């Protein structure tokens, strides 16, 4: 009896761990909600990408709904979504966070592809990304006029997601 218990206990523990791992792998990271939903953007003081002597904080954010877009010049999906951000910026302010990037590379990318951002934060060391809970770029946050995060999208922002997810949420914010 004791030998069976000694043999089967680790087997059941291993089986339980395997089930938990498989369940975790089946989760879509884009659907994992941020712990910051309905909370203010975390406090930070970081350099402006284009003017490193200028320190940026949430006090500089627009006083209307806006997007907070985490990107990097090294990120293929960031480059892919960039033309859509240029279009969105015509109707909605976007604040950019150049995440874990070389400052000069970020500036070169914006010169080459266009700059959709009203403000670009240099997060070359990832401090703001850590506070936001960023798990990779790109990530796009919808922030309300009070600086409160209302939605987080992890991964490529495409036209369909913009139209079916973001636009209704923005309309709801404007109508409240």
UniProtKB/Swiss-Prot annotation:
<dbReference type="InterPro" id="IPR013740">
    <property type="entry name" value="Redoxin"/>
</dbReference>
<protein>
    <recommendedName>
        <fullName>Probable thiol:disulfide interchange protein DsbE-2</fullName>
    </recommendedName>
</protein>
<keyword id="KW-0812">Transmembrane</keyword>
<keyword id="KW-1003">Cell membrane</keyword>
<dbReference type="InterPro" id="IPR050553">
    <property type="entry name" value="Thioredoxin_ResA/DsbE_sf"/>
</dbReference>
<feature type="topological domain" description="Cytoplasmic">
    <location>
        <begin position="1"/>
        <end position="4"/>
    </location>
</feature>
<keyword id="KW-0201">Cytochrome c-type biogenesis</keyword>
<comment type="function">
    <text>Could be involved in disulfide bond formation. Could catalyzes a late, reductive step in the assembly of periplasmic NrfA c-type cytochrome, probably the reduction of disulfide bonds of the apocytochrome c to allow covalent linkage with the heme. Possible subunit of a heme lyase.</text>
</comment>
<keyword id="KW-1133">Transmembrane helix</keyword>
<feature type="topological domain" description="Periplasmic">
    <location>
        <begin position="26"/>
        <end position="176"/>
    </location>
</feature>
<dbReference type="InterPro" id="IPR004799">
    <property type="entry name" value="Periplasmic_diS_OxRdtase_DsbE"/>
</dbReference>
<feature type="domain" description="Thioredoxin">
    <location>
        <begin position="35"/>
        <end position="175"/>
    </location>
</feature>
<keyword id="KW-1015">Disulfide bond</keyword>
<keyword id="KW-0997">Cell inner membrane</keyword>
<dbReference type="InterPro" id="IPR036249">
    <property type="entry name" value="Thioredoxin-like_sf"/>
</dbReference>
<comment type="similarity">
    <text>Belongs to the thioredoxin family. DsbE subfamily.</text>
</comment>
<keyword id="KW-0676">Redox-active center</keyword>
<dbReference type="Pfam" id="PF08534">
    <property type="entry name" value="Redoxin"/>
</dbReference>
<feature type="transmembrane region" description="Helical">
    <location>
        <begin position="5"/>
        <end position="25"/>
    </location>
</feature>
<keyword id="KW-0472">Membrane</keyword>
<dbReference type="InterPro" id="IPR017937">
    <property type="entry name" value="Thioredoxin_CS"/>
</dbReference>
<dbReference type="InterPro" id="IPR013766">
    <property type="entry name" value="Thioredoxin_domain"/>
</dbReference>
<dbReference type="GO" id="GO:0030288">
    <property type="term" value="C:outer membrane-bounded periplasmic space"/>
</dbReference>
<dbReference type="GO" id="GO:0017004">
    <property type="term" value="P:cytochrome complex assembly"/>
</dbReference>
<dbReference type="GO" id="GO:0005886">
    <property type="term" value="C:plasma membrane"/>
</dbReference>
<feature type="disulfide bond" description="Redox-active">
    <location>
        <begin position="75"/>
        <end position="78"/>
    </location>
</feature>
<dbReference type="GO" id="GO:0015036">
    <property type="term" value="F:disulfide oxidoreductase activity"/>
</dbReference>
């Amino acid at each position: 009896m004791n030998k069976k218990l000694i043999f089967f206990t680790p087997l059941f523990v291993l089986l339980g761990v395997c089930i938990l791992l498989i369940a975790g792998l089946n989760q879509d990271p884009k659907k994992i909600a941020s712990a910051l939903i309905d909370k203010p953007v975390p406090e930070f003081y970081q350099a402006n990408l284009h003017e490193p002597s200028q320190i940026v904080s949430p006090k500089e954010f627009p006083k209307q709904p806006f997007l907070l877009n985490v990107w990097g010049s090294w990120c293929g999906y960031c480059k892919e979504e960039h033309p859509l951000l240029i279009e969105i910026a015509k109707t909605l302010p976007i604040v950019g966070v150049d995440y874990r990037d070389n400052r000069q590379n970020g500036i070169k990318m914006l010169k080459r592809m266009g700059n959709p951002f009203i403000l670009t934060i240099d997060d070359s060391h990832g401090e703001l990304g850590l506070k936001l809970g960023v798990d990779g770029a790109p990530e796009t946050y919808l922030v309300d006029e009070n600086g409160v995060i209302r939605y987080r999208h992890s991964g490529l922002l495409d036209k369909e997601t913009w139209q079916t997810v973001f636009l209704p949420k923005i309309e709801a914010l404007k109508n409240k």
